[in-house]
């Protein structure tokens, strides 16, 4: 279509101004709408406990958001977190090193990409009246205490697949007793449920991570039977409790995503290690509203030394878990740790 000269000039003038305006707009700062740019990842967590201190710190301090990650956290109890990661229902799983071993023993290789905790944090607390009846006192050596628990019922996590159960099973066998015959080990659910079961006498002993054994002791319902958080039983002192795992094929296809999630965890672990326990407890307190402040603080003080600031895997710690699971009959073949864990995704 032919335009009159004046209209052609007006059109060109408008077009030129539009280009200039567009150029100037491009020079303006672009607002950061982090919510729209973030990548959503699904992560399983097998329990609510301070054993996942670095994860709670990362969430509270916004480290996942800083990495461009929108974290969708799903609590999956009873060892079902391993099934969730294997099936692809979740992308990541914060789990026990034992979970990695159980998957391997079942013929499935998962990949550990971050060392969450480098020591055993599963404590056993025994009812006061049961301890008195069996003649168990805190002054006794741990092996002597354990030899006296014949006939008791231990509540240990949410099922045979979880590490509190396996730690209890290992300690019973170390005492020369037979699980299922001399001592009953059963699932008691989450920590709050176990506290009720202990208080009402449905179980004699609880095997749980902090803060639950500490709460039972604080409430006057129990005394300590084995304080692994304090290194009371030396065979469990080299024990890498928990790891962040992914499916190997997911890690291969999503290297950047795994690196960002690991980066958030590493930043949180450094923050936990570098800050005072009071500050750490204050920050994560919103996740543990039912825990008395003094118990929460003392529990953080117990957990802090187990947090690995750089998240690097420890072969000695991994083999410590392997040995316990071998004694329990879960692991029967050599474990190729160089194939099951990696430090590849750690911040450089």
Functional labels for PLM-detected ranges:
Residues 193-286:
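Pocket-lining segment of extracytoplasmic ligand-binding domains
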Residues 322-348:
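Conserved C-terminal helix/tail region of periplasmic/extracytoplasmic solute-binding proteins
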Residues 37-180, 185-188, 204-210, 227:
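Short, glycine-/small- and polar/acidic-enriched structural segments
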Residues 1-14:
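N-terminal secretory signal peptides that target proteins for export/translocation
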Residues 19-31:
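Bacterial N-terminal signal peptides
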Residues 252-330:
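Secondary-structure end/capping motifs
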Residues 66, 131-137, 231-237, 304-314:
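Short, solvent-exposed loop/beta-turn-alpha elements that line the ligand-binding surface or hinge
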